[in-house]
Amino acid sequence: MKLPLKWLKDYVDYNVTHKEFASKMLLRGFEVADIIPEMKVSNVVVCTITHIEQHPNAERLRVCNIDIGAENELVIVTNATNVYEGCQVPVALDGAILADGTEIKPTKMRGVLSSGMFCGGAELGINDVEYEGAGADSVLILNDGTKYTNGMRIQEALGLDDVIFDIELTPNRPDCQSIIGLCREAASALGQKFHEPVIKPVAGSGSAADYAKVTVLNPNLCPRYCARVVTDLKIEPSPKWMQLRLKLSGIRPINNIVDITNYVLLEYGHPMHAFDLACIEDAHIVVRNAVEGEVVTTLDGKQRAVTPDMLLIADPHKGVGIAGIMGGLNSEITGNTKVTLFESAVFNAANIRRTTQKLHHSTDSSARFTKGVEAVNAELAVNRAIELVDILGAGRVIGSMIDVCNADISEKVVNADVCHINRILNTKLSGESMAELLSSISIPAEVCENKLRIKVPHFRTDIEDGIETDWDIAEEVGRLYGYDNIEPTLMHGDSFQGRLSRSVIIEDRVKDTMAAMGFMELYNYNFTSPQEYDLLLIPENDEKRNTVRLQNPFGEDQSLMRTTLIGGLLRTMRTNCNKKSGHGRFFEIGNVHFNNPDLPEERKMLGIIAYGGTGNVRNAENFFTLKGIIEKLFEILGIENARFERGGGAYLHPGQKAVVSIDGEVIGEMGCTHPRVEKNFGLSCSAYLAEIDFNKLAAHTNNSRKYRPLPKFPIVPRDIAVVVDRNIEAQTVIDIINTAKTQVIVENAKVFDVYYPKEAGDKGIPEGKKSMAFSFELRSDERTLTDEDINRSVNT
């Protein structure tokens, strides 16, 4: 926020150096990021050209006599063709320093002594923003209608003799997005009285309701809408003092009516807009949501497609502005405007923020609305605009204001505990001292039984009533009292030994285990595209289609919150394969989100992908290596009773997939990619995937360590082959082996081979059957097993 020094002096008695002011403001929480001095030229003054004649020795040079307010006129030799007798121009005299550091000395030019040099905008270091015409590559003609005193410093003539403080603001202080708000804080920092502005009422004649009508269809997004009407407009440039202040604040002057709205924006921090009432059908302002497919052409000439969640200012038939962002081109103030309606409204901050983001268009108005404006300020702003209309004689003011108010504008009173504030700040201030400090920034407070009863001014929207009140007031008291005045003390309080939660411990263990098995961790975006679910062959009625749509996505390809990690894993694989990295092992622990009627549900998932190989078939990734990886992870986590059974998602190969369960609860699925999925994602080879519900996995994790003595007697390994029906799963046979009732202990049963006969009778295997080979271990805690014990157990 730019604060011109001269504007500051309208409200505050300024009695310090600029650096001291910056230091004092910093201690109050406002950093002065830059101090911009006045125009950096010296000994450049205004002159009037009294006579011009051709140079006697040069065809392209002219000799000018100039009046600088001294007794004798000076002579300037120039090649400028745009100067003429009677015009006023800047002239650099003997010893002048220009913006680029050039020093000017009297010089003979083809036999005629020139006492200086006429200056253009480039020599003065200014452009068209500071003064119209300064951007031209010629001498600057001072033709703004003002008769300047000859010899006047050019800084004063152009109004660029002001110092600008560029002040950084924090988001919690929207009241300081105004000159008045900053000056209020500056007065307190300097220990001076703040000269509160008083708006002079302009009664006018008639009633605004006779000229216009306002209807607010969505009071939640527009709690207050104030309007006043001015007729018999005289559209002309605003006075120089107003133009200078706008320019110094970075705003281009347009005409008196538009400049008034911008001036009030800077002064009070409340955005306004002026409509040409003749362009509003039936003179009826309607504040409504946009309709699907509606387009509004804004003042910058761009057509902007608006959506139903955006708020528009409209008439009964068309939009005439995007609320809080920018007015419409079809109702702008022009030289032919005779009647205007001044709008001063309050719009919902969150809605304006979303609209700004969707339209990718931010303005000075939207910047203030997104931080929040105050309902009381709407009336003050429109009345200040009317006062300026009266001061400038810009038109005939119509009497009463139109006010559609659904906002709470009642006075807010809060109570704060003096003792608690002192404990927070480690101070010993009395309630009276605190009240005096608060009064310096226009916050009235009374002391009653060690309590502060505070009437919160309308512009301090950051002070809330509730459990945070003491902290809000302590913040104000602390910065006003001065943090450098608070005695430093050592921190004290109860300390507790920190510890990681069970979930974090398990997550770290999973990450360590996966890394030990050669996996690298991924962090993919939580966003995905609607098309990805089609690429993964996910059925329309599948839970994974129950997605959360983003209101303001980066693009359509990132418009949904993901419900599975699989898409991101496959995209990572594709990227790596395209970069000639044909082998990889990756895992990701991330959140997925499902759309529920009340609130979206967030789940943490573990995703695993392995693909490619070293060229050796035995070392290539396959279904069984992935199964072994998952089993090893379960072993590290102390999980028993895990089962792998037929089933799994549609994105997995029908013959190479399984659901994973623990103690009967399904926690995930694993398998090889479906050939169609490989084609959809453009994969060069198959991938082996697993997705496991991390929270369910953690629930079955056993952190306790059980002591198991080493076997006293030898373990005997055995292999068997059995012929079973083709639809019999290996897990079914493993369960039979592990639960066989024998006199010895049978454990660690695993399948290591499956053979399907090529034809009936092949290797003695009947039609419809298959051969499966299993390994297992036999042992006894009491004795060494004999061949008879072993054979009896195997035959069982």
Predicted regions and their residues:
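Mobile "lid/hinge" segments at catalytic clefts and subdomain interfaces of large enzymes
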Residues: 110-142, 155-159, 163, 311-411, ...
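Conserved mixed alpha/beta core segments that line enzyme active sites in large multi-domain catalysts
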Residues: 48-76, 150, 244, 255, ...
